[in-house]
From Swiss-Prot:
Subcellular location: Cytoplasm
Domain of life, per lineage: Bacteria
GO molecular function, one term: nickel cation binding
Gene: ureD1
Subunit structure: UreD, UreF and UreG form a complex that acts as a GTP-hydrolysis-dependent molecular chaperone, activating the urease apoprotein by helping to assemble the nickel containing metallocenter of UreC. The UreE protein probably delivers the nickel.
Protein known as: Urease accessory protein UreD 1
Residues spanning the signal sequence: none
Record organism: Brucella anthropi (strain ATCC 49188 / DSM 6882 / CCUG 24695 / JCM 21032 / LMG 3331 / NBRC 15819 / NCTC 12168 / Alc 37)
A Gene Ontology cellular-component term: cytoplasm
Pfam families xrefs: UreD
Similarity remark: Belongs to the UreD family.
Keywords: Chaperone, Cytoplasm, Nickel insertion
Amino acid sequence: MIINNNKLAELSSQRVNGLGGLSIHFKDGRSRISRLYQEGAAKIRMPQVGGDPLEAILINTSGGLTGGDRLQWDVELGENASAVITTQACERIYRSGGGEARIATRLKAAKGTRLAWLPQETILFNQSVLSRTLDVELEEGAEILVVEATIFGRLAMGERVDEAMFSDRWRVRLGGRPDGRLVHAEEFRLGPDIGAELQARPVADAACAVATVLLISGEAGKHLEAARQIIGEEGGASLWQVGPATKLMMRLHAPDSYTLRKRLGPLLALLNGKAGLPKVWTF
């Protein structure tokens, strides 16, 4: 038997490329889809809900990402629309054979809108490489709730992350334009010795599960004390006024994903009001 190594190399170099786009407008008393775009591994499904907010579930059909893979989500809300966006499952970032996996999210919200970006956790495996970016453009009067949770190895499965590269970049701007006023920025980087870096108290205090939650809303202040009660000693919450934007910033850490989710779930349910948690979130 003769094996064509060139063909094997071609197959091994195939990469995941996914792009999903969703535009939502408010018409006839409720939020409705005005545009839906799916390409490659990115799929979007809408479960039945009894009214606003519209709920959308993002799916990566590849089952995970590794070096060289690309996944992008674009969500835009028209005036007075509301939506909750989540993922079907945790995103998995596998060992890289070269290059980085990239996840890019772009959110736009017009005035009078409320957008909740609530993906399930991202799980990093040993020797994985991930670059994650989040770009948000808000018109004045728009509200947004954002969470990004990251798990460094599943301890219950005997997995550890000693070496990996992870970067997480956020930019949130007012004015509904890419050059609008910057009201929030994150620039978080770990690696290559992630296992050792996570031990440091200012980083994660030996935690293997972390989450960042951001609420920008005129009513953010009323949730401060309740959020602190839920978060407890393993994390914190702070309130700022940046121009016309009131933002509540929260961080949580835990020894494992289950312990993190036991606090993260109630926190998101509190902050997301009547919409609560997406249906696909389980405990």
